[in-house]
């Protein structure tokens, strides 16, 4: 049995407000993803992918932790159904696509600070 969810954290050297402006647009980098929530006050963005031939679909939660001139982004990708042996790799690929798009839109590199 595979892992149901994967969490990774990244640091961006930009203020939260600037990074959050790009957060919703970065969802487009994840194939077939639909934005379900973007709450600046709650410091969270959520989106999901539909069930398909090779996947039960995923729920993705992006949390923002503001710091002094930087922001840590914690992103969790979890399957909506039963995990399989390839789920962790699929989760990490979706996280990677989102973080790469967010980094490009913000104009700064993301540095990974933690992973599960």
Predicted regions and their residues:
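Ser/Thr-rich, low-complexity intrinsically disordered terminal regions
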Residues: 1-116
């Amino acid at each position: 049995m595979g892992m149901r969810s994967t969490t990774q954290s990244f640091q961006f050297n930009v203020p939260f407000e600037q990074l959050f402006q790009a957060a919703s647009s970065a969802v487009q980098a994840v194939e077939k993803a639909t934005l379900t929530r973007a709450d600046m006050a709650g410091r969270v963005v959520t989106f999901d992918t539909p069930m398909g031939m090779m996947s039960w679909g995923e729920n993705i939660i992006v949390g923002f932790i503001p710091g002094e001139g930087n922001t840590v982004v914690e992103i969790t990708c979890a399957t909506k159904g039963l995990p399989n042996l390839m789920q962790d790799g699929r989760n990490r690929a979706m996280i990677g696509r989102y973080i790469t798009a967010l980094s490009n839109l913000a104009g700064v590199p993301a540095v990974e600070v933690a992973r599960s």
